[in-house]
């Protein structure tokens, strides 16, 4: 397998740091290598004989900025490390940055700009499934390649997307299995009103019913909704044993703070969340979220040598108060996996890179553990970790799968999912 050692790269990067700082346009900061939030490209972003240009496409403004900034920062960290270690195929990476502004239509427009006008070699971007689905036809029409870093609802596969976050069998399904094994039977489903939560809840409903459980309520909130009083009243009336939370962005802040105002804690209404990571805990407050559960593949507390190096590098670059998270780590992995695929291909050409990926041997010794791109569906083999939020603001693993889990985005290996006939929501 083609593997990259994070410890070796970190050591080499440290020894070359002074050299790297002298290189023009190496992608070391947003101001000198990418673009400003309004999309104005700096001079250093121009491609040349010694550089290769990539795109970063995330929400720097709007309701999703709370989550996507950390993902963008992790990508920049990976770019800086790779540049300090010699670059990719002898070229330094420069990045062009665009703001999706938490609007799917804006993501589509900015994706086309990166591909058609900026002529980037690849794009790292998106968070919500709505933004991913908005850009998917753009990448397919231009035969460009998107690296998508966030867990999602599955039911999708594209030759022009590499999915470095979890498929549903690597986050949602094992989390529900964990709760069922713990004796939870009455589930309340709460989500933002878009593709991921609605499809995720179709999956969860089928799984819970097949196991003899009950969904006692299902509610959705607009992405910019701030008043959760009516939804909280419905939760009180339903009296669930567990809330399954697929809210995204600032909705999580409003919901949990309003629950806290009613003195509801994890003791009264325990919650399993699929889009709350360390960054959101820092924003909402550990005093509010302690005791609640989450399901991911990585936490800042994950005990691997590669993660220790990653956390130290992230905090050194962005500040000791900053925290890492699963989506940030998956975004960081994506840059290294792209590097490995280009080096196997011997080219930045999209078709050559896709051909290299199809061999199923592109791996990275990531902070979460070794991840490998499945050559057929372009999702990653990943470990699964259930975590609990503690009062120090960190998330600690309470369960993990004994081995990494192969991706099954369409849940074809689960009889209850096949029988339910779950279909993607467009």
Where do the model's predicted regions map?
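Extracytosolic ligand-binding ectodomains
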Residues: 2, 27-426
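Bacterial N-terminal signal peptides that target proteins for export
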Residues: 2-13
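Hydrophobic helical h-region of N-terminal Sec-dependent signal peptides
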Residues: 14-19
């Amino acid at each position: 397998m083609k593997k990259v050692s994070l410890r070796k790269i970190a050591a080499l990067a440290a020894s070359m740091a002074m050299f790297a700082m002298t290189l023009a346009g190496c992608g070391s900061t947003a101001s000198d290598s990418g673009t400003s939030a309004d999309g104005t490209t700096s001079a250093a972003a121009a491609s040349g004989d010694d550089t290769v240009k990539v795109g970063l496409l995330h929400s720097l403004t709007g309701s999703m900025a709370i989550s996507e900034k950390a993902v963008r920062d992790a990508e920049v960290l990976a770019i800086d490390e790779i540049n300090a270690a010699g670059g990719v195929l002898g070229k330094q990476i420069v990045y062009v940055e665009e703001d999706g502004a938490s609007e799917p239509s804006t993501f589509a427009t900015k994706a086309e700009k990166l591909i058609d006008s900026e002529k980037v070699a690849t794009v790292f971007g998106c968070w919500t499934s709505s933004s991913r689905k908005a850009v998917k036809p753009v990448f397919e029409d231009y035969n460009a390649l998107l690296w998508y870093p966030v867990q999602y609802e599955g039911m999708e596969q594209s030759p022009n997307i590499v999915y470095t976050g979890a498929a549903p069998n690597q986050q949602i399904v094992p989390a529900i299995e964990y709760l069922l094994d713990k004796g939870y039977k009455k589930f309340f489903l709460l989500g933002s009103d878009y593709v991921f939560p609605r499809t995720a809840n179709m999956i969860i409903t089928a799984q819970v019913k097949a196991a003899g459980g009950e969904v006692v309520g299902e509610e959705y909130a607009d992405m910019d909704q701030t008043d959760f009083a009516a939804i909280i009243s419905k939760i009180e009336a339903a009296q669930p044993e567990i809330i399954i939370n697929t809210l995204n962005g600032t909705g999580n802040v409003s919901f949990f703070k309003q629950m806290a105002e009613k003195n509801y804690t994890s003791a009264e209404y325990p919650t399993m969340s699929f889009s709350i990571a360390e960054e959101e805990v820092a924003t909402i407050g550990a005093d509010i979220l302690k005791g609640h559960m989450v399901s991911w593949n990585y936490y800042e507390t994950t005990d691997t040598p590669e993660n220790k190096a990653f956390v130290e590098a992230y905090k050194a670059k962005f500040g000791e108060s900053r925290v890492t998270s699963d989506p940030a780590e998956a975004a960081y992995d994506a840059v290294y996996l792209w590097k490995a695929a280009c080096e196997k291909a011997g080219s930045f050409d999209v078709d050559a890179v896709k051909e290299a990926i199809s061999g199923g041997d592109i791996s990275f010794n990531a902070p979460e553990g070794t991840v490998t791109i499945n050559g057929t569906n372009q999702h990653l083999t990943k470990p699964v970790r259930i975590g609990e939020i503690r009062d120090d603001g960190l998330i600690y693993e309470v369960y993990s799968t004994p081995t990494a889990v192969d991706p099954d985005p369409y849940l074809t290996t689960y009889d209850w999912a096949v029988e339910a006939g779950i279909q993607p929501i467009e």
